Design a protein with these regions (language model features):
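HIT superfamily nucleotide-processing domains
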Residues: 1-201
């Protein structure tokens, strides 16, 4: 199977995606750490982009995966998320997000954005619903505080005094999620290792 034509994309392409697909990998500028922090601080998540060749591979893989499993949700439930979770709607052990470790799963993102070397994109899936604003699709103030508390506990504190400067996180708005059936669940952030090494968490 060759490249997927834009008009046959297996998920809605944003204007940024279409622009990226018009580029070569050599023309593409990866997101650096400072730019990434600015994007997340201003909540302009729509500008996050994959490398052109990665986006083409992601489109192809998504089409093949949907053909094999019927949906991305089925693939994730079969291969990436804990079997005890079952099928959505899930029945979490706690109604408080991230309170019970069996209610979330931390994974390296299989299809990260185009990031500078040393930055790793990690996704946190939660079977406990994290409330969003029905009008904007963004997190509520309380949800943002809940996620921040988890990020601090799970990622920042493990890095000691330098942790706060080395971790950023975000949650895609509903409109930007490629797996809508599990749309309430993915959480992502970023971590920078000591020295010049950086990671996205």
């Amino acid at each position: 199977m060759g490249d997927i034509p834009v008009e046959e994309a297996p998920f809605p392409l944003t204007d940024v995606d279409k622009w990226v697909l018009s580029q070569t990998d050599e023309e593409f500028k990866k997101h650096g750490w400072e730019e990434l922090k600015e994007i997340i601080a201003t909540n302009k998540l729509e500008v996050l982009k994959r490398k052109p060749s990665d986006l083409r591979r992601y489109m192809k893989w998504t089409a093949e995966t949907k053909a094999e499993y019927g949906s991305m949700t089925k693939f994730l439930l079969t291969n990436r998320l804990p079997k005890p979770w079952g099928e959505p709607p899930f029945s979490p052990k706690s109604t408080v997000p991230f309170e019970d470790p069996s209610d979330y799963r931390v994974l390296v993102n299989d299809w990260p954005y185009g990031l500078d070397p040393g930055i790793t994109h990690i996704v946190v899936w939660s079977r406990t619903i994290i409330p969003t604003d029905p009008e904007t699709g963004d997190m509520t103030v309380e949800s943002r505080r809940t996620v921040q508390d988890f990020i601090d506990r799970y990622f920042v504190k493990t890095l000691g005094d330098v942790g706060e400067d080395r971790v950023v996180w975000f949650k895609n708005w509903v409109a930007l999620q490629s797996v809508r059936a599990l749309g309430a669940y993915p959480r992502a952030g970023a971590r920078r290792r000591p020295g010049s090494h950086q990671e996205v968490v």
